[in-house]
């Protein structure tokens, strides 16, 4: 009996270089036209090797590709973009002057009012008070992260977290999540990351004992920079 073994492609440095070159040409957000005979000049490989690697990247679903007269139309997939985001995270660690600091910046965004509802539920509110040592204002400050900070968001998992357990109030079940203690302009606060959420990955919710919008005179669209440290976090407008 013969066994068919399919090779699994693992990105190498040259392969990541291809993704980077495509991204620099705009293939992250749009479809770009690429000619193997021209593209290979930017990679150092032969045109034959460039054509083979682009085909391989399509097979691994790192790019979407369509052959057209004079070249091919290419757009990066979420999988390909994620590889570059991970590269970005690693480089940020290498060149950060404070390796234990995570800086997230974004713009204040109008919320949907859900934060007020959940914070007022005793099963959550009591845990916030007990574990975070403050009674949160009934509402959250929503911040939409910039593209670069969105790529770094996964590093929150490396920071010390306060676990908020899920519970059942007799009528329905409420899920758990993690809180990351922070300071925003000297105000005790926390980033709330539910286990399950319908919010996009580039949105973070911050709770505090005061209404941060009023305390920091924030309005929709204002830029806020938050520095997350392994022993806490500080933020600034």
From Swiss-Prot:
> Signal sequence span per UniProt?
none
Question: Which reaction is the catalytic activity of this chain?
Answer: riboflavin + CTP = CDP + FMN + H(+)
Source organism, top-level taxon: Archaea
Region called Unknown, residue ranges: 1-101
Single GO biological process annotation from the record: FMN biosynthetic process
Q: Which InterPro entries match?
A: RibK_CTP-dep (IPR039063), Riboflavin_kinase_archaeal (IPR023470), Riboflavin_kinase_CTP-dep (IPR023602), Riboflavin_kinase_dom_sf (IPR023465), WH-like_DNA-bd_sf (IPR036388), WH_DNA-bd_sf (IPR036390)
Keyword vocabulary terms for this entry: Flavoprotein, FMN, Kinase, Magnesium, Metal-binding, Nucleotide-binding, Transferase
Residue sites binding CDP per the record: 111-116, 210-213
What residues does Mg(2+) bind to? Answer: 140, 142
- E.C. no: 2.7.1.161
Cofactor(s) essential for the protein:
Mg(2+)
Q: In which pathway does it act?
A: Cofactor biosynthesis; FMN biosynthesis; FMN from riboflavin (CTP route): step 1/1
Q: How is the cofactor bound?
A: Binds 1 Mg(2+) ion per subunit.
The residues that hold FMN are 197, 205
MF annotations from Gene Ontology: magnesium ion binding; nucleotide binding; riboflavin kinase activity
NCBIfam families in UniProt: PRK14165.1 (NF010762)
Family from the record = Belongs to the archaeal riboflavin kinase family.
Provide the function of this protein: Catalyzes the CTP-dependent phosphorylation of riboflavin (vitamin B2) to form flavin mononucleotide (FMN).
Please report the name of this protein according to its UniProt entry. Answer: Riboflavin kinase
Q: What is the lineage of its organism?
A: Archaea, Methanobacteriati, Methanobacteriota, Stenosarchaea group, Methanomicrobia
The gene behind this protein is: ribK
């Amino acid at each position: 009996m013969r066994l068919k073994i399919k090779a699994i492609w693992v990105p190498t440095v040259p392969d990541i270089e291809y993704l980077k070159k495509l991204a620099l040409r705009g293939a992250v957000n749009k479809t770009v036209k690429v000619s193997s005979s021209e593209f290979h000049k930017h990679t150092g490989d032969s045109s034959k090797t460039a054509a083979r690697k682009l085909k391989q990247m399509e097979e691994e679903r790192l790019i979407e590709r369509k052959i057209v007269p004079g070249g091919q139309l290419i757009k990066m997939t979420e999988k390909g973009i994620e590889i570059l985001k991970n590269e970005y995270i690693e480089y940020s660690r290498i060149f950060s002057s404070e390796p234990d600091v995570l800086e997230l910046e974004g713009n204040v965004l109008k919320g949907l009012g859900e934060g007020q509802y959940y914070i007022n539920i005793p099963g959550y509110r009591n845990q916030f008070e007990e574990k975070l040592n403050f009674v949160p204002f009934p509402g959250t400050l929503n911040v939409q992260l910039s593209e670069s900070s969105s790529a770094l968001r996964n590093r929150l998992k490396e920071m010390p977290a306060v676990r908020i357990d899920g519970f059942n109030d007799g009528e329905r079940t409420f899920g758990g999540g993690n809180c990351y203690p922070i300071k925003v302009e000297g105000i005790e606060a926390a980033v709330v990351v539910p286990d399950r959420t319908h919010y996009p990955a580039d949105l973070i919710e911050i709770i505090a004992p005061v209404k941060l919008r009023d305390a920091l005179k924030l309005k929709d669209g204002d830029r806020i920079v938050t520095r997350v440290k392994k022993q806490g976090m500080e933020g600034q407008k």
